[in-house]
Amino acid sequence: MKKNYISIFSIFTFVALFLIGCNKQEKNILKPNVLFISIDDLRPSLGVYGDSIAITPNIDKLAMDGIIFTDSYCQSAVCAPSRASLMTGIRPDSTRVWHLGDKFRELKPDAVTMPQHFSKHDYHTVNIGKIFHNYMPDSVSWDEPDLRPARYLKKDWLKRDGETFYISEKVNTSQSIKRDSLLKIKPIRYADGWNTGPAWEAADVHDTMYYDGAQTKLAKATLTRLAKMNQPFYLGLGYFRPHLPFAVPKKYWDLYNPNQIPLAKNNKIPSGAPLYSMNSMYELRHYDGFSNIGHPTSSYRMSEDVIRKLRQGYYASVSYVDALLGDLFSHLIKIGIYDNTIIVIWGDHGWKLGDHNSWGKMTNYNIDLKVPVIIRYPNQENRGVKTDGMIELVDLFPSICELAGIDVPDYLQGTSFVPLTTNPELNWKHATFSQFHRRPKVSADGKRYMGYSINTKKYHLISWYGWDSETGTRGDFKSNELYDKEFDRFETQNLADRLDMRDVIIKLSNQLSEGWRKALPEYTAQNLIYTDSKK
């Protein structure tokens, strides 16, 4: 009898464990995968965003199977602050990441990033490429952090060495010499890979010979492996182009005739804008042949031939990444996981291509703040639609959580925009909020400032203050910039000094002071919680 009891008990236990395992497996299978794609320095220069020059058939095709957000803003127009805000779901004044060198994990050691949160909900999280800032892959966030193609794992290379950008042996020899020299002079600064060479390259090679192509090949192999797991995955895949240098295969350069690419329509700094509003172009200045370019506020003018070459390089880089994504999406279909995968494409900030007599990001102007966001998810009701509802990159964390059906942390400072995917015409946020820290070494007058930006549908207000970098607090008010987006979408004329704009500035200044919570869509759960807490 005792033996029978043990036998029956063993069978019961086995069946129970089997059923639990099946339930867990079934639960995981039902969860959608997440493919989270960052494209560095990508402004909305895509066909689906109305850019008639851009050749981006694959991104456009995905957009026709998803939703396009046409009025999206980053929280800060430079890599580290923008990405730290997006990935933690909190804003720059909360992360305290204000410029490139700030490392969010040192400033916020207990921060729970988006992939960490997904990992807590039984997702297997993997990182390939640039999701956080270059040399800050944040191994804490991933089950498999910072995977790289095998040929880029050389012991003597820096974390993001300049030699990973180029094909030319001559250039790479020069890069190696430069790297070793810089490490001797400033070992701490250059240990993370601050090593630049030519601003462009167009080698006649296969796509996989450049880094982005090699990591796409790795991503395909990784996806094949992940598809066989009985667990949903979150893959963060970050592309380096179209960030400088514009080093991509020649065939993508050949897609564009530089003489047929129109020049920037707003090639002057905004009239009436303060000098410290503009970036110094120090990013471009680091590349060969550009060390002597002037500040945008000076009389310096780049030659038209060079302007066209740079613009051609940017568009070629965008088309290169587009082709790689086409290959990646075809692979998702081939291995049978496309239908059950949330795909997100986002740019971390915009980029000036001669706009405002400048190159690069690092301003509070909308040419730098506006970004593309495209999302495709399983069982989506509306496909191929656009919404002009205002969203922010900080909204991605709660939105992807909701789409995946997992809990949304209540401390996040973004708002899930999932309701816009079911009703693109929904009356949404009243405003978006951004900021930029202007450091003395790159400001026109050698002083330090913080500019706070609020965008509404009609206006864009930028308020500048002095800034105490030690305490992280604003000082005295310095100036305002006001732009009428309806009549001046290229932001050419600062209206802040006009008497008839005083009431507008007062209203917008109050909105800016009240902050993001007061700009929430009506009747969202987040808004109701905030309102109730104020009673």
Language-model-detected regions and their locations in the chain:
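Extracellular, beta-strand-rich glycan-interacting domains
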Residues: 487
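Short hydrophobic beta-strand that contains or immediately precedes a catalytic carboxylate
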Residues: 482-483
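Formylglycine-dependent sulfatase
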Residues: 2-9, 13, 22-474, 478, ...
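Short, glycine/acidic-rich hinge or "gate" loops at secondary-structure transitions
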Residues: 525-526
